[in-house]
Amino acid sequence: MSKPRKPKGRPISGWLILDKPMDFGSTEAVSKLKWLYKAQKAGHAGTLDPLASGMLPIALGDATKTVPYVMDGRKIYEFTVSWGEERATDDLEGDVTQSSERRPTEQQIRDILPRYIGTISQVPPQFSAIKIAGERAYDLARDGEAVEIPSREVEIFRLTLLGCRDANTAHFEVECGKGTYVRALARDFGRELGCYGHISGLRRTFVAPFSEDAMVPLANLVALEAIEDMDERLAALDALLIDTCEALSALPHLVINDDQAHRLKMGNPILVRGRDAPIAESEAYATARGRLIAIGEIGQGEFRPKRVFA
């Protein structure tokens, strides 16, 4: 019987909060960082369109197991809407599908915003990663197929008009939940105002729980390639990583001993009784000696592991 293949790359674990430049795809960014860090695995926590810039959290190594906890977090975007044209992609890339000479006043824009705050029904753009009958909507759209994408509920926590540089554009900031399409907001604003609209600028500034000052520009990472000594270069890159546990900061935290850590790594539950144990049944994570050991469920006085870390 052949031995299982040893994964290629370094067994590192952590998050790099990339400040993604425009005209650089999210998948391309993940591949670049995986190569730079010589990591075994890499993945991002939410696609950022190539025309968008800003925060793209990228998980390396075992941190990829925590991606779902970041995907579910709140996000903040700054975006510019250009009035007068609706486009196939709802951004600058697409062909113009509708146009209007009408332009909204600043007060008219402010008047519609309250209707987009809270739980709203939103139809994703035709060019989106939504699956229709097993195929991505953007693949069907590129093939010229007009598909009906069902609406879905999304959460908008805050929506602010930051200003209007001129009659043709308006600048906004939105704090929203998982699955919200900012391009769809621009499209819907334009339709309601009777002037049509599309995204002409988009920047993500926050993905919970990571703050804007954690972002590292791609140019800073590329500059480290000039360090000839590989060990020195990797050490400089590793210094930019955020601890894997940061992605789990919204969950209850258990500090355990070495014996308990061993039990969890073997897939066995541990007792969590005592004054510091969480009372309510919930998901939680456990660390020993500052290292992440497992994510699991607390219930009936036990912590049962779901995901175990090396």
Curated annotation (Swiss-Prot):
Source domain of life: Bacteria
Alphabetized UniProt keyword annotations: Isomerase, tRNA processing
Cited CDD domains: PseudoU_synth_EcTruB (cd02573)
Pfam families cross-referenced by the UniProt entry: TruB_C_2 (PF16198), TruB_N (PF01509)
Function: Responsible for synthesis of pseudouridine from uracil-55 in the psi GC loop of transfer RNAs.
Family indicated by similarity: Belongs to the pseudouridine synthase TruB family. Type 1 subfamily.
Protein name per UniProt: tRNA pseudouridine synthase B
Organism in which the protein naturally occurs: Rhizobium etli (strain ATCC 51251 / DSM 11541 / JCM 21823 / NBRC 15573 / CFN 42)
Lineage: Bacteria, Pseudomonadati, Pseudomonadota, Alphaproteobacteria, Hyphomicrobiales
